Amino acid sequence: MKKLFTLLFFSLFFNIALSQTNTFTVQYFDVKPGAQSDLAALYDSFFEGVEFKSGGLYLERMDRGDVSGTHRIVYFGELGNSGMVEGSKTRADWQKFYADRREFIEKRGPSYTGRIAYSNGVDPFSKGYFQLYEAEILEPEKFIPAHTKAIDNDWAYEGNAMLFGSYDVGNPGTATHWAAFGADNLQSLMKWKLYVEENPEALAEYFSTRGEVIELGNFSLQILKQYGGF
């Protein structure tokens, strides 16, 4: 049955997705106490000014919620056209970067790869503070249009960023999809939640049309650094 849901997701995905298939890989890890500034400086020295074929990467710090790490890196870009422009870094450059990074990392966590199915077009880095929801979507043929409609018609508030997508290679628990909501800060995020709740008719329509969803949890994070562009 899950294979059927996956096939349905594929067919729907190409109808509502961005103009190209955008993918991401996220890697969680624990940074040694007090080492965040040094780690950020290392990323600056290696990635700042580098040209990407498409997309780029974020260095993020976990804030609230139960997650597997204190920080994470998110690489993103077009499928088949991501990563640095050829010749930007040598093999020796990468080896030194990874060796230097190990000095600041206490423990490595899990990694997942998936797709960014839809975005409202707001640059995530312009917001900086995000809440992410993870869920097992049992009826993607219902969820995708319902969630897209809510983003486009009902949830826009003070230029907030909204996007969602799938986990395709590796996943946290039984999660198949994720949804992200970005604001300027925690207080702005809470105001957005109140704004959504003040439109109970739209909220009721969303929950009644999105199909069966098993919500698995949520957490918040801050985007510390951006290299490349969304």
Show the residue positions of the predicted features.
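Short S/T/G/P-rich N-terminal loop/turn motif that feeds into the first structured element of a domain
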Residues: 19-203, 208-230
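Sec-dependent N-terminal signal peptides
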Residues: 3-17
